[in-house]
From Swiss-Prot:
This is Nucleoside diphosphate kinase. GO terms for cellular component: cytoplasm. It comes from Pectobacterium carotovorum subsp. carotovorum (strain PC1). One of its GO terms (biological process) is CTP biosynthetic process. It is found in: Cytoplasm. The lineage of its organism: Bacteria, Pseudomonadati, Pseudomonadota, Gammaproteobacteria, Enterobacterales. Keywords: ATP-binding, Cytoplasm, Kinase, Magnesium, Metal-binding, Nucleotide metabolism, Nucleotide-binding, Phosphoprotein, Transferase. It catalyses: a 2'-deoxyribonucleoside 5'-diphosphate + ATP = a 2'-deoxyribonucleoside 5'-triphosphate + ADP; a ribonucleoside 5'-diphosphate + ATP = a ribonucleoside 5'-triphosphate + ADP. Homotetramer. PROSITE patterns: NDPK, NDPK_LIKE. ATP binds at K11, F59, R87, T93, R104, N114. Belongs to the NDK family. The keyword Kinase applies.
Length: 142
């Protein structure tokens, strides 16, 4: 197995529910190590830049508004096959299709307010990590 890093966001609806600690506990119980984390409130420029690949899609404006609606937590998770394992823990993007026990089944409110974001590939993880963290903000713990 390969040790990877993946990027994750706890979205505004999950932060508003005070679910940060519960979500972090799930990450750690699954064997992930948090190597970087911070809370922030996205500006329009940050939200549009982060989701630029979705610009022009029908859900883009609503997603940007939602991501600006409150504080978020951004974090870097490290572990074996981190990208795929985090996606498994999150559950389906549409919470109506998320398996019981996944983060989205437990904390999502809707397709947009689906509690968490996670990178979909190693390449996306690298790009997304670099969007929010400088190299000196990442603290390997092993």
């Amino acid at each position: 197995m390969t040790i990877e890093r993946t990027f994750s966001i706890v979205k505004p609806n999950a932060v508003a529910k005070n679910a940060i600690g519960s979500i972090y506990a799930r990450f750690e119980s699954a064997g992930f190590t948090l190597v970087a984390a911070k809370m922030l409130r996205l500006s329009r420029e940050q939200a549009e830049g982060f989701y630029a690949e979705h610009k022009g899609k029908p859900f883009f404006d609503g997603l940007v508004e939602f991501m600006m609606s409150g504080p978020i937590m951004v974090q870097v998770l490290e572990g074996e096959n981190a990208v795929q394992r985090n996606r498994d823990i999150m559950g389906a993007t549409n919470p109506a299709n998320a398996l019981a026990g996944t983060l989205r089944a437990d904390y999502a409110d809707s397709f947009t307010a689906n509690a968490v974001h996670g990178s979909d590939s190693i390449e996306s993880a690298q790009r997304e990590i670099a969007y929010f963290f400088s190299d000196d903000e990442i603290c390997p713990r092993a």
